[in-house]
Amino acid sequence: MKLKIAEQDIVYLSYDEPNAEENYADLLSKVPWAKRVHGVHGSDAAHKACAELCETDRFITVDGDNTIDQKFLNQTIDLDDGQDLTKCVISWCGKNIINGLTYGNGGLKCWPKEYVLNMRTHENADLTNPHAQVDFCWDAQYIQVKDAFSTTHNNSTAQQAWRAGFREGVKLALDRGERISKEDFFTKNHYKNLHMLYVWMMVGSDVPNGNWAILGAREGLSMTCLLYTSDAADDGLS
């Protein structure tokens, strides 16, 4: 099966990002037909709003702090004909402007519409499912693409940079959404997560508001190890 990016609905998903209008204008200059969902509280509800807006079986989300590479529109993804794609989310890497990390955080995502309409994650997650309370990636079947076709600009203000660092400081310190004891932190946490966590806490002081991102990551890690609740990763949304 071939999935042509240009044939999918593309939705700009923004909440309160200080650079949202600037980034939306940039997206419209590249994708004039892009749709938009703005200001919906809760990650689960916001993604459902995207799905309800779309007319295609799959849709692509562009986060409010993102700008895309126009080459993305020319991409075609080859998928296994025998694979069940009804729960598969295709995730591209995004490059973080603060510290240069390139991974799934902030990257473009291609979602199956019906799955999104029926999923229960974040604020709508079952209380017995700690994984879904923190992120989408452990309940859905993620197909991670190594290519990066977007840049995350999450340092327009000190608050935005701090929040970006804080959320990653929390999430990268968890094991599939669950807290790791201090004794097991370095043995149970994936080495890639530890590397990215180190970068978030050490790199970026040379860019605007980068020190705030570093502080946020350190505070997020500290709270996770000492005071963690399942709401910690969402504290920055309020």
Which role fits each region the language model picked out?
Residues 73-173:
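Conserved catalytic core of nucleotide-sugar-dependent glycosyltransferases
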Residues 1-52:
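N-terminal anchoring/stem segment of glycosyltransferases
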Residues 21-22, 70-73:
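Short glycine-/acidic-enriched loop or helix-start segments at secondary-structure transitions
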